[in-house]
Amino acid sequence: GFKKGKVFLFQVRPVVLKKNYSTYKKEDFITALNKLKNKIIKLKKKNHNLIGKTTYFGVMPDWNPAEIIGIKPKALAISLYQELITDFIWAKNRESYGFNDMTSNHLMSIFLGTPFIDVRVDFNSWLPKNLNQSTKEKLINYYLNIFKNNNDYHDKIEFKILFTSFNAETNDRLKQINNNLISLNEKKKISKELKEITLN
């Protein structure tokens, strides 16, 4: 600021320089990649808290960190995003509407500085809580299979894969699922539960 011709500095910060990656050794990169591989292998394993035999990851599903905080966000942005949304709040909100309680699961994982959404966690969070376990398992396997085979759906999962509410297309979409995967009675129950959630 200026006052009577004098300059007053309110805050002084050091100049931020870009990281010099040439100081890293090849072994550092190999170690980092091996740690990442082990982390992903662990996350993809069957989890007693989650329905689904494995998982996949994406930067655009659900809360879409790629658009909201970027592909390589600063540590502060990641921390705030986790605290305000992806650690707990996201799941509490869905649970309050009548979906599965996923409050013990984090939605987002960080891989070498890039935020990824855990798709299995996301899909579990959209299961109506009053569906029986068998129907939930069938739905999750159906969702995961579609996601795996359609790379262009990563930013469209709420419209192309999941049943997140009841609308004019819900019953038609359910009819398109093979009855050997999900029975007619199960489809009726899914439709009923989605309708109750949507009307509440």
Q: Predicted segments — roles?
A:
Residues 1-200:
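Conserved divalent-metal-coordinating catalytic cores
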